[in-house]
Amino acid sequence: MNMDERLQAFKRLLDIMDAVRAGCPWDSTQTIQSLRHLTIEETYELSQAILNDDLNEVKKELGDLMLHLVFYAKIGQEQGAFDITDVLNGICEKMIVRHPHIFGSEHVDNAEQVERNWEKIKLEREHNRSVLGGVPDGLPSLLKAYRMAQKTAGVGFRWLDATQAWQKVEEEKTELFEALQTPADTAHVEEEYGDLLFALAAYGNYIGVNPDDALEKTDKKFRERFAHVEQRAREQGKGVQHLTLDEMIAYWKEAK
């Protein structure tokens, strides 16, 4: 696809948005606030398409998200706050500033250096912003822990290597075990359990594993294996709740 075709396709979307915003009873009443939960839903649908490795569905979901981005820009324009040009120029400038090794004279040897430079550049340009200011509170907790550890590592607050990071996991595991010796103190148990989860999430940065991706794959594996257990129960004319634990374990192992 050449440049003209891309521009024409984008203009077509903008024109359609202008039309539905002006004439559709539903589109004309939407606000930035009313669209928020719908955008979250669309993002999760894109995530599911990616997990399913369904590129045709990824294409469709990207279109849905693109519509939402144009929708927000249209509302911003109506309110005199910003328009699509401001949005696009803003991200273009951000990309140029954050890639001095592409658009400037800086040299980097690997992706880790690029990430560290990003954090340095952001702090220099936004003097009063916390290192963790770019991690939304609304992120799922496991992913948020991973990103917080990643962000602080970018400014040097990190273990030297994966071995040290794992030692922290072992330390937190021991502290949780000790807390469990007093099970009535549920607040302390919860705190230590949280510390262990955070340490495991942070450890992912040292072994190149995103914990959210890893857990998602394990969730999928668990679902598929338990579906096999349920299928084996149906073959016997039983509900899964009527299987013995030994039977469940045997069918579970079959699914591995």
Where are these regions (language model features)?
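Flexible "arm" and connector segments at domain edges
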Residues: 1-61, 67-193, 197-256
